[in-house]
Amino acid sequence: MPYTKKKPIIIVDGSLYLYRSYFTFQNFNSNEENPSGAIYGMLKTIQNILNKNYNSKKIIIIFDSSKKNFRNTIFKEYKSNRSAMPNKLYVQIQPLFKILEEIGIKTLSILGIEADDIIGSLAYKLEQKGEQVLIVSHDKDMIQLITDNINVLNISKNSILTPEKIQEKYGIYPKEFIDLLALMGDSSDNIPGVPKIGIKTALFLLKKFSNIKNIYNNIEKIQSLPFRNAKNAAIQLKNYKKTAFLSYQLAKIKLDVPINITSEEITLKKTCFKKLSNLIRWYSFNE
């Protein structure tokens, strides 16, 4: 069971786990008027997070807002491949927020700001204050935020991602993951990337040139490099330069969103664990 020796502040990717909870417990409650599977799933997820990180006393859960953000402005197709939120999930959101408030767990969403940007900005701000941060998410976008003081917990795989683990797996630094997504694209967010540039080619180029800016500064050298289809890759990069840099803007998580959260707001009260357990038990009995 992974846990960190210090006491990190936990930032949960609430939108991600809200959807996951909804689909996992879609048939949890057959009551058409008051579905509760997403609520139950979120409470179980929070309990699991706190059990795995029992030495942490500060937690905040971040959610997307319904309003579009700057990425939709610069690229209208951003996330356009995603279906609208199911109504059975939508009706559980406000009740969930009220329940979390009763328990004493802080939530945050900001109109027109994507959850990823809130998470990144808050994590960066806390790191600047000397805090250790643990982001709970299995979204690959979060990899770019990883530092010695900001780690990412994937509760499904029971693993904590660190800079060393990212370098071991990909051979690049976490911050270069933005460039990786810019080159190869990201179908889940509908980020285009450069067509026909896959992960192997992208990683080869980043290991040699570090970032897309440096790749384009050395664009004439690429066709002669020792990797498969180097000539075709060079042509694709030249033809889709604007798309590559647009994709970089879409993939890069903002670190400068103004966030005013006090330490007291995110500190768990002693009654939190009991309230959480009681609610989970109540939902289990009333399923």
From Swiss-Prot:
Q: InterPro entries from the xrefs?
A: 5-3_exonucl_a-hlix_arch_N, 5-3_exonuclease, 5-3_exonuclease_C_sf, DNA_polI_H3TH, FEN, HhH2, PIN-like_dom_sf
Any single Pfam family the record assigns to this protein? 5_3_exonuc
Q: Which domain of life is it from?
A: Bacteria
Question: For this protein, what is the EC number?
Answer: 3.1.11.-
Determine if Hydrolase is one of this entry's keywords. Answer: yes
Which positions fall inside the 5'-3' exonuclease domain?
172-270
Q: Which UniProt keywords apply?
A: DNA-binding, Exonuclease, Hydrolase, Nuclease
The UniProt GO MF terms for this protein read: 5'-3' exonuclease activity; 5'-flap endonuclease activity; DNA binding
According to the record, the signal peptide region is: none
Q: Which GO terms describe its biological process?
A: DNA replication, Okazaki fragment processing
Tell me which PANTHER family the record gives.
Answer: 5'-3' EXONUCLEASE FAMILY PROTEIN, FLAP ENDONUCLEASE XNI
Role played: 5'-3' exonuclease acting preferentially on double-stranded DNA.
Instruction: Supply the name of the protein.
Output: 5'-3' exonuclease
Q: Which organism is it from?
A: Buchnera aphidicola subsp. Schizaphis graminum (strain Sg)
